[in-house]
């Protein structure tokens, strides 16, 4: 029963981290690409 309580929290936390990390990496990559093209 303890695993059932911890597992959903870990899954939501994992999805939240990746949901924020993926757009952040894409945003930083696009900014670095624009700066590289301008130079």
From Swiss-Prot:
- Which spans are transmembrane here? 14-30
Give the subcellular location: Plastid, Chloroplast thylakoid membrane
Keyword Phosphoprotein attached: no
**Residues reported in the UniProt entry to bind heme:** 18
Disulphide connectivity of cysteines: none
Q: According to the lineage, what is the superkingdom?
A: Eukaryota
* Primary location group: plastid
- What's in the keyword line of the UniProt record? Chloroplast, Electron transport, Heme, Iron, Membrane, Metal-binding, Photosynthesis, Photosystem II, Plastid, Thylakoid, Transmembrane, Transmembrane helix, Transport
The record describes how the cofactor is bound as: With its partner (PsbE) binds heme. PSII binds additional chlorophylls, carotenoids and specific lipids.
Looking up InterPro entries in the UniProt record yields: PSII_cyt_b559_bsu, PSII_cyt_b559_CS, PSII_cyt_b559_N
Q: A biological process (GO) annotation for this entry?
A: photosynthetic electron transport chain
Assembly mode: Heterodimer of an alpha subunit and a beta subunit. PSII is composed of 1 copy each of membrane proteins PsbA, PsbB, PsbC, PsbD, PsbE, PsbF, PsbH, PsbI, PsbJ, PsbK, PsbL, PsbM, PsbT, PsbX, PsbY, PsbZ, Psb30/Ycf12, at least 3 peripheral proteins of the oxygen-evolving complex and a large number of cofactors. It forms dimeric complexes.
What protein name is recorded for this chain? Cytochrome b559 subunit beta
